[in-house]
UniProtKB/Swiss-Prot annotation:
This protein's pathway: tRNA modification; tRNA-queuosine biosynthesis
Keyword hit for NADP: yes
NCBIfam families linked: QueF-II (TIGR03139)
Name this polypeptide is given: NADPH-dependent 7-cyano-7-deazaguanine reductase
Annotated catalysed reactions: 7-aminomethyl-7-carbaguanine + 2 NADP(+) = 7-cyano-7-deazaguanine + 2 NADPH + 3 H(+)
EC number: 1.7.1.13
Coiled-coil regions, chain positions: none
Taxonomic lineage from the root: Bacteria, Pseudomonadati, Pseudomonadota, Acidithiobacillia, Acidithiobacillales
EC top class, as a word: oxidoreductase
Length: 141
């Protein structure tokens, strides 16, 4: 039976809650609709998080992202919604979500969200996170 889009995110217990470690996910195939024109908008999300007690289950994340393909939303609203839903689900020690929205009308948009649990800090591991590289539009590309 084929999978269907679903807003139901699932989680599982962190197998090593005693340790800070980074989970990196590359999510290159996100699609939703422009709320003004109804035209498709495409984004590449890059997610980094340091789990506390839970991790997000990958198939549910895929189906969750797929569920937005026919929904209209501004880039900033959609990126924040996804971050809020993930934070609400797994309450990570740290989360960073970069939404890299593809060129529309000659403009690229990057939306970066960062969240930390109150009082949590680990500068050593945060220094190991991949550097955010802002999109650079080049004519003809």
């Amino acid at each position: 039976m084929p999978s269907q889009p679903s807003r139901e995110l699932e989680r599982f217990s962190n197998p090593h809650p005693e340790r800070d470690y980074v989970v990196h996910m590359d999510l290159p195939e996100f699609t939703c609709l422009c709320p003004l024109t109804g035209q498709p908008d495409f984004a590449h999300f890059m997610l980094d998080f340091i789990p506390d007690q839970h991790n997000v289950e990958l198939k549910s994340l895929k189906l969750y992202l797929w569920s937005f393909r026919d929904e209209g939303a501004f880039h900033e609203a959609m990126t924040n919604r996804i971050a809020d839903d993930l934070i609400g689900l797994i309450n990570p020690r740290y989360l960073r979500l970069l939404g890299r929205w593809y060129v529309r009308g000659g403009i690229t948009t990057d939306v970066l969200i960062e969240h930390r649990q109150p009082g949590w800090q680990n500068p050593d591991i945060l220094g190991q996170l991949p550097t955010v590289r802002w999109a650079q539009h080049q004519p003809g590309h």
